[in-house]
Amino acid sequence: MEDDEEETTASTLRGKPRPPPVSAQSAFSYIPPRRLDPKEHSYYYRPARTGIISLYDCIFKRRLDYDQKLHRDDREHAKSLGLHVNEEEQERPVGVLTSSVYGKRINQPIEPLNRDFGRANHVQADFYRKNDIPSLKEPGFGHIAPS
């Protein structure tokens, strides 16, 4: 009779937690704990590198040093410090960012560079620099006043 009884512990007394009611759940509420999709399905076109950090570590094991470059040092990625935006952008097959820095594909040019008329541009600039052109000295549009 004593062998049939289970050992009473705190976990057996608590029991299983009850799931929330159906009315509290959304159709889009399920988020998988870890995505194992190929890198082609991700926004950054690279496999996910997420670490598991417990809530205890987030609260009680904070870094105590001071970073003077951050506006507030409780923000982890303020001013994009610690992020690898340029590497992520270069790995994508199609650029997403439209800034002047990351939107240009220097290593993947759209068309090959054409330097055939470089000498013509150089001669034209040299001609306008050396010759006295009256239209540039007359008052009006494009007038250059000597100082």
Swiss-Prot record:
Keywords: Cell projection, Cilium, Cytoplasm, Cytoskeleton, Flagellum
InterPro entries: CFAP90
Cellular localisation: Cytoplasm, Cytoskeleton, Cilium axoneme; Cytoplasm, Cytoskeleton, Flagellum axoneme
S-S bridge residues: none
Keyword Protein biosynthesis listed: no
Record's subunit section: Microtubule inner protein component of sperm flagellar doublet microtubules.
UniProt name for this protein: Cilia- and flagella-associated protein 90
Organism phylogeny: Eukaryota, Metazoa, Chordata, Craniata, Vertebrata
